[in-house]
Structures are given as structure tokens and as C-alpha cells.
């Protein structure tokens, strides 16, 4: 009988990416892989799109809020139902372990696995824990973290960032689509790539639309999240979504303008790619992106510009400063010790699962 592992995590792409890195490795080693999530969530879309041999189990989900809302009353019942569904799934499958990447959907499966005596491993990417992982930590066997955490968190293993980016641009798959884009770009201009993520692309889209003069100063690549904006014209490539082109576009850019999500930031760090961070503020997030951006700026990896300050004048100043000190930023990024390979983390996780099973 094959070993079984349950994955969970969702709500944003960032809560799915690491799972999609690990899952093929478990499948290759003969594990039967199952995933618990929201059937209407990004996790279901990404699992389906991956084509991986994964059985998806849908549960009811409710948002966990730090503030009062009448929706909390309805969501209490959704979370309770999700817990009952998770208990049934875990009891039926009897997996060796559960791995969670976080997000609201992950809490019921984590609690269910713990109640049924299954080892629970969770991962936190941000400088500070989100509410879902604060709850999940209480039920976890081990929590792996990208950033160092408080000393009193005894179950934490500081890992660093796990990425699968190609550091060598020559390793990346060739793309006829990319060659077509280059035909519209000028070799005399710097190329900027704007990555807004699922929650933050709109501001970048509007900034580019409001300032057509940017196209006279730079080649612009804009990942918009909106298919209605798709365009390929002189000095401008707007595309709603990319997969295979993602890393080649980063490699093609001289500088990346990004939000403050930790997954993207550490991918840029791994590629030693010059970048400007415009983090989501507390009105659009819990403040984790502000913390991530400040961390990267203090480490000398990047420069940050707050969203309310995103004017053309301030943007031009930030570009000038980054390009003037490009060599210093790149040298600092190349010297980082904060990046781990997927194989390293997979081996560590497998070893920890084995140890947890033996200790039961």
C-alpha cells in the first residue's frame, strides 16, 4: 500500500506555489497525494492546471477575521462544516502526514489531522505569521519559516526561502512568444517588468495607463491579471497571466517592479534581479508586505516605495537610484545565504515525517 500525504493551502497563489514544488517529488517517490481546499479557490485551479496526479477534496471554507463582522457568524458555521469534512477525509485516507502552506482553508484540515493523531507540518513565508498560521501553529508538529521567528516558538525550523528559479538564464526554455515581444522593444531602452500579483496588479495597471510617457523611457512588461488589457505594441507588452514565460520575462527585464509578497521577493533574490518593492498597505493586507519590504530594504536587496507615494516623479527617482547603485544591490543579493533548493527542503521534510511517524 503506497504512503499517503495530504496537502492543504490556498486563497492566493502564494499559498499554493510551494505545494506545487513539493508534490511532484512525493509522486516521483511513490506517494499517493491528496489535496484539501476550496473547489472555487485558486488552489483548485492551480492543481487542475498542473496536470499532476493529485486527488482534490473540496471542503466548506470561511474567512478568519480579526475584526467584528456579521459575516463572522455565517463563517463560523462554514469553518465548523469544513472541520467535520476534514475529519471525515483524514479518517478515510489515513495519511502518513499533512503539509499546510497556510491560508484560511488550511485551518480545518490542520486541526482535523492533529485530532486524529497525524503529524502536521506547516510553512510560513512572511516576516510575521498570519492569523491562519497562528492557529495552525498550536496544532503543528513543526513549522518551517522563511524568516527567523521569535525564540519562544519552539516548534519552528528556520529554513530560508525555497525557490525553483533558474539562476542561469541559459537554462530557461526558449520561447517563440518571447522573441515576438522583443521585436517590439528597443535595445536602447531599459526593460521594466511590473508584477502585481493576484491582489495588487490594479495599481500598476493604472499607473502605466496614466503615464504613457513611460513607454518613451522604458520597454514595459505588465502582468495585469486582466485579459481585457492584453496588448503588444511599441515598447509595451501587457499580458494577463504567464506560467512558462514567468522566469524568462524576469530574466529579460533589467528591473522588476513588484508588490511585497515573499514568494516573488525571494524569487527575485535568488535570481539577483534588481527590483523596486511597492508593498500592499494595511488597508489591503494585514501589513505583512510592509514588513517584507522593510526587511529587504534593510538587507540591501532592494528599494521600497510606498503605494501612496507612487507618482511619476518618485518613480523616476527610484529608478535612477536603483540603476546608479545596481552593482551594489546585485553583489548583496548574490552573497545571500537565505535561499534553499527544493531538493534540500524535500529531503528535510521527508526526514521529519519519518521521525514523527516513529515517535507516534
From Swiss-Prot:
GO terms for cellular component: plasma membrane. Its EC number is 2.4.1.227. The keyword Protease does not apply. It is a peripheral membrane protein. It is found in: Cell membrane. One of its GO terms (molecular function) is undecaprenyldiphospho-muramoylpentapeptide beta-N-acetylglucosaminyltransferase activity. GO terms for biological process: carbohydrate metabolic process; cell division; cell wall organization; lipid glycosylation; peptidoglycan biosynthetic process; regulation of cell shape. PANTHER family: UDP-N-ACETYLGLUCOSAMINE--N-ACETYLMURAMYL-(PENTAPEPTIDE) PYROPHOSPHORYL-UNDECAPRENOL N-ACETYLGLUCOSAMINE TRANSFERASE, UDP-N-ACETYLGLUCOSAMINE--N-ACETYLMURAMYL-(PENTAPEPTIDE) PYROPHOSPHORYL-UNDECAPRENOL N-ACETYLGLUCOSAMINE TRANSFERASE 1. This is UDP-N-acetylglucosamine--N-acetylmuramyl-(pentapeptide) pyrophosphoryl-undecaprenol N-acetylglucosamine transferase. It comes from Streptococcus pyogenes serotype M3 (strain ATCC BAA-595 / MGAS315).
